[in-house]
């Protein structure tokens, strides 16, 4: 089941400026980037210590102003398939688990107000472990 909070995700207008703030102003470590097939960066992970992270994704100015910058909370789970099965048995709608570009398993649920919650299971190859 749930073992902790893995990360909090924010949409930012300027990814470079955000990385500078977290890394150079707060003294946190920029761990890895999310990149498109063409190599362009669209997001990153900032380590807060241990396996706790801030996840940043760049978004257009209109989207950031139109909606809050907070995107979701992510709960670390020990066994993604088992957790998804248990949640479904409890009547929770849950997406099928998939392996993300960070080599970690993820599935998605929502609370009654529609707030997105990511379920996240690390693998031996998870980029978060390389920090």
Predicted segment positions?
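Vicinal oxygen chelate
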Residues: 1, 84-131
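N-terminal beta-strand motif that seeds the catalytic metal site of vicinal oxygen chelate
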Residues: 1-17, 70-73, 125-131
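Core segments of cupin and vicinal oxygen chelate
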Residues: 9-51
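A short beta-turn/loop motif at secondary-structure boundaries
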Residues: 36-38, 63-64, 99-101
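Exposed loop/turn and edge beta-strand positions of beta-sandwich/beta-sheet ligand-binding modules
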Residues: 40-42, 69, 103
């Amino acid at each position: 089941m749930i073992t902790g909070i893995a990360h909090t995700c924010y949409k930012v207008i300027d990814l470079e400026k955000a990385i500078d703030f977290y890394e150079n102003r707060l003294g946190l470590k920029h761990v890895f980037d999310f990149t498109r097939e063409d190599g362009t960066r669209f997001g990153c992970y900032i380590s807060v210590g241990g396996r706790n992270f801030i996840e940043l994704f760049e978004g257009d100015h209109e989207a950031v102003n139109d909606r809050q910058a907070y995107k979701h909370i992510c709960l670390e789970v020990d066994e993604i398939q088992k957790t998804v099965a248990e949640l479904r048995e409890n009547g929770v709608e849950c997406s099928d688990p998939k392996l993300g570009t960070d080599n970690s398993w993820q599935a998605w649920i929502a609370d009654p107000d529609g707030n997105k919650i990511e379920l996240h299971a690390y693998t031996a190859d998870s980029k978060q472990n390389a920090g």
